[in-house]
Swiss-Prot record:
Domain of life of the native organism: Eukaryota
Taxonomic source organism: Mytilus edulis
Identification of the protein by name: Contraction-inhibiting peptide 1
Keywords: Amidation, Hormone
Modification type Valine amide: residues: 6
């Protein structure tokens, strides 16, 4: 996922 959301 992204750094903010898995």
């Amino acid at each position: 996922g992204s750094p903010m959301f898995v």
